[in-house]
Amino acid sequence: MNTLVVDAHVRIGQHREAALSVEALLAAMDRTGVDRAVVAPSEAQIAYDNRAGNAATTQAARATGGRLVAYAVANPWRGAAALDELAWAHEQGARALAVDSALQGFDLLDGLVDPLVRFAAEHRWPVYVRTGTPPGHLPLPTAALARRFPEVAFVMGRSGATDFWIDAAPALRHAPNLYGDTSYAPWDTVLGEFARDPEIGTSRLVFSSDQPYATAVGEMRRMRDWLLPAHERAAVLGTTMAGLLGLEKEPPA
């Protein structure tokens, strides 16, 4: 049986320094053997125009028959309106929450995002938190947030890349419901450390290309070069993320 490959985080649309259309993403997935990808909207839509962003991701999911899976976004500064936005996105088919506290302008531990995480918990959504921007948008604060919500699966986006990789393993040890993503991380150092750590292991890692900031070919090549037992490779490449999302084990036709 072929290994199911799920890309845990991609951003579609026009960004400040890059862009990725749905068509270009699907072509990249075909070239690299990715079955499904979880898509977040553009930077501006994450920060401000949440409705346009949620419409973009959920429409992409419907148009591809579920090959693309939608993240929902809402700026927590909007208060009750942010929860209404997540409810709308849920009705449209979103299956996870994406948070970028640097873009959205809040501290992970100031309580502002907590109502959104509670919404995710109620709907059994995993929560992606992009990390790597100092001073507050980092692995250890993400782990502290995850500890507040042990019933929620958190994905530590970029695993602190690149200056804060040193904090990624301690963060994963601190919060057992936190998962690292593989984007940018060398397999022979960062990912190898995760895999060898008895408190982490490959079952706590999910593959992410983080397009359009990284390339699908480069990220997948590093995964293919990483020598892992077949069952561990399958978990990293797709089955763990599929489980967090509640997806079927086989990709859609």
Please place each PLM-identified region on the residue numbering.
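Mid-to-C-terminal alpha-helical segments outside catalytic/metal-binding sites
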Residues: 1-8, 19-36, 202-204, 217-253
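Active-site neighborhood of phospho(di)ester-bond hydrolases with catalytic His/Asp-centered motifs
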Residues: 5-8, 38-41, 71-73, 98, ...
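Histidine-centered catalytic micro-motifs
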Residues: 5-13, 131
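Conserved, mostly hydrophobic/aromatic
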Residues: 9, 29, 57, 61, ...
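Active-site environment of divalent metal-dependent phosphoester hydrolases
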Residues: 13-15, 44-47, 76-80, 104, ...
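A general structural detector for well-ordered alpha-helical segments in enzyme core domains, enriched
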Residues: 24-28, 53-60, 85-89, 112-116, ...
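Active-site gating/metal-coordination segments in enzymes
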Residues: 35-36, 44, 48-126, 174, ...
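Catalytic pocket-lining loop regions of alpha/beta-barrel enzymes
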Residues: 96, 109-206
